[in-house]
UniProtKB/Swiss-Prot annotation:
InterPro entries linked to this entry: EYA, EYA_dom, EYA_dom_metazoan, EYA_dom_sf
GO biological process: animal organ morphogenesis; aorta morphogenesis; branching involved in ureteric bud morphogenesis; cell fate commitment; cochlea morphogenesis; double-strand break repair; embryonic skeletal system morphogenesis; epithelial cell proliferation
Annotated organism of origin: Mus musculus
Membership in a protein family: Belongs to the HAD-like hydrolase superfamily. EYA family.
Protein name: Protein phosphatase EYA1
Domain of life: Eukaryota
Cofactor comment text: Binds 1 Mg(2+) ion per subunit.
First-tier enzyme category under EC: hydrolase
Outcome (variant: residue 43 to R): Markedly reduced sumoylation
Gene: Eya1
NCBIfam families membership: EYA-cons_domain
Length: 591
């Protein structure tokens, strides 16, 4: 096969095919005695004549992919009459041993090397700063190298600028493998060249800090993270004691896992392909589950939390993004329009039935407020928020406290009525007022998911029957609202806030009887009876800050004007379709 190519007519070519140095050029055109078939100076280990013969006999070596060395390597010189494509039109023979090229090639006014073999950094390494596991950047430059015969192709010392290993390797060694991917504990390496022998995954040693293309990664050994991270840029299990070559298989252990520091819960990955250990750090408070919140709240006393916060706010590291401010009547529940019959007239229902259901629910609301929530004592001392008077609470145990004999009702019904702010004066009286609001808070948190247990068996059945009749009359209005409320409540970065014109105690009774306690913690309920909704919005902004997005959902003019003043988006609810559209927008995460 070689003889067929070498005997093709070339008027300026002389020499035999058995010449180790390849075909010789006519001396009338060039003084050089020989040149390599591919026109390059490649220094390799000398081979014996028997190896040359066996290599030449291998038919699979007749082709060498042109993509092996990139698009610009071994490009023909357009002005040179002895370019390799004219000598060998279709094939090149890298297995034929070259001889040192003549130094008189410079007489033709061209450099001795082609563009791909220049010492310039035309093919510099491509740094990839986004690679976290130390994959060498020069690996991508060798991705296109491919041979069909498994022939090893070593790199010449004169080719350091082409596909170089970067600044860490000053002089590439002959016979060194072109690349080695270090990928989580295993390296796809070759023994002496590209795809020579059996290609397999070998456990080669990782690069140390002096062999990396990236000389320094930021270390996390300072400050409060010292217990989680090593002080050195590379963890100990990434480093080896010996300064080995990137492709030299290591006989000693490569994976040296360090012991985690005391007090840090860590779990090492048992997969042999993993070189790092996963440290399970505690989650942030905003991401904790409901069970974790309950467990954290149960041991609150043991952590010495004595002072009460009148206006609770989210923790500093909270990632709260959106606050949904809801109106209650005619937005979440249908109550006032039942009493007036306007809902029945609008939707074609029976007005007397509607009014009857409204009156029954109103009676149940005030009965619950008077019996269990001290509404008779607190009606004239209404508060905007449940914690507004908590600063007057001395933390006394109320398990054996008798609210009926402490003298508070007599003082409340005296001529000196409560002021507009709900504060009358007197340390003793204010403490008793704070006791009642604290007891209301305890009852709400205890029975918000079990209102039937608070009502008793007889009233529980009447309450469930009334709820079912109202839902049937209102075409499941409350169910549609609860779907949107529950979706918001399930998000860790969103919160539901209730602002109602009803007094605080009756509003709490409404929330409990309509089954809304699960989506409205008592700290998120505000009464706008005394100060108006716009002032409530200002308190909410002061509580959560101005970095979050506020969305107001209601049906009235007052909440719409308050939202407009504070540049808050307003979602009007006037029908079932508005609630369904709201839930759809929440599902698509538009809100």
């Amino acid at each position: 096969m070689e003889m067929q190519d070498l005997t093709s007519p070339h008027s300026r070519l002389s020499g035999s095919s058995e010449s180790p140095s390849g075909p010789k050029l006519d001396s009338s055109h060039i003084n050089s005695t020989s040149m390599t078939p591919n026109g390059t100076e490649v220094k390799t280990e000398p081979m014996s004549s028997s190896e040359i013969a066996s290599t030449a006999a291998d038919g699979s070596l007749d082709s060498f992919s042109g993509s092996a060395l990139g698009s610009s390597s071994f490009s023909p010189r357009p002005a040179h009459p002895f370019s390799p494509p004219q000598i060998y039109p279709s094939k090149s023979y890298p297995h034929i041993l070259p001889t040192p090229s003549s130094q008189t090639m410079a007489a033709y006014g061209q450099t001795q090397f082609t563009t791909g073999m220049q010492q310039a950094t035309a093919y510099a390494t491509y740094p990839q700063p986004g690679q976290p596991y130390g994959i060498s950047s020069y690996g991508a430059l060798w991705a296109g190298i491919k041979t069909e015969s498994g022939l090893s192709q070593s790199q010449s010392p004169g080719q350091t600028g082409f596909l170089s290993y970067g600044t860490s390797f000053g002089t590439p060694q002959p016979g060194q493998a072109p690349y080695s991917y270090q990928m989580q504990g295993s390296s796809f390496t070759t023994s002496s060249g590209l795809y020579s022998g059996n290609n397999s995954l070998t456990n080669s040693s990782g690069f140390n800090s002096s062999q990396q293309d990236y000389p320094s990664y930021p270390g996390f050994g300072q400050g409060q993270y010292a217990q989680y991270y090593n002080s050195s840029p590379y963890p100990a299990h990434y480093m080896t004691s010996s300064n080995t070559s990137p492709t030299t298989p290591s006989t000693n252990a490569t994976y040296q896992l360090q012991e985690p520091p005391s007090g840090v819960t860590s779990q090492a990955v048992t997969d042999p392909t993993a070189e790092y250990s996963t440290i399970h750090s505690p989650s942030t408070p905003i991401k904790e589950t409901d069970s974790e919140r309950l467990r954290r709240g149960s041991d609150g006393k043991s952590r010495g939390r004595g002072r009460r916060n009148n206006n609770p706010s989210p923790p500093p590291d909270s990632d709260l993004e959106r606050v949904f401010i809801w109106d209650l009547d005619e937005t979440i529940i249908v109550f006032h329009s039942l009493l007036t019959g306007s809902y029945a007239n609008r939707y074609g229902r029976d007005p007397p039935t509607s009014v009857s259901l409204g009156l029954r629910m109103e009676e149940m609301i005030f009965n619950l407020a008077d019996t269990h929530l001290f509404f008779n004592d607190l009606e004239e001392c209404d508060q905007v928020h449940i914690d507004d008077v908590s600063s007057d609470d001395n933390g006394q145990d109320l398990s054996t406290y008798n609210f009926g004999t402490d003298g508070f009702p007599a003082a409340a019904t005296s001529a000196n009525l409560c002021l507009a702010t709900g504060v009358r004066g007197g340390v003793d009286w204010m403490r008793k007022l704070a006791f009642r609001y604290r007891r209301v808070k305890e009852i709400y948190n205890t029975y918000k998911n079990n209102v039937g247990g608070l009502l008793g068996p007889a009233k529980r059945e009447a309450w469930l029957q009334l709820r079912a009749e109202i839902e049937a009359l209102t075409d499941s209005w409350l169910t549609l609202a609860l779907k949107a409320l529950s979706l918001i409540h399930s998000r860790t970065n969103c919160v539901n806030i209730l602002v109602t014109t009803t007094q605080l105690i009756p509003a709490l009774a409404k929330v409990l009887l309509y089954g809304l306690g699960i989506v409205f913690p008592i700290e998120n309920i505000y009464s706008a009876t005394k100060i108006g909704k716009e002032s409530c919005f200002e308190r909410i902004i002061q509580r959560f800050g101005r970095k979050v997005v506020y969305v107001v959902i209601g049906d009235g003019v007052e909440e719409e004007q308050g939202a407009k003043k504070h540049a808050m988006p307003f979602w009007r609810v006037s029908s079932h379709s508005d609630l369904m559209a709201l839930h759809h927008a929440l599902e698509l995460e538009y809100l």
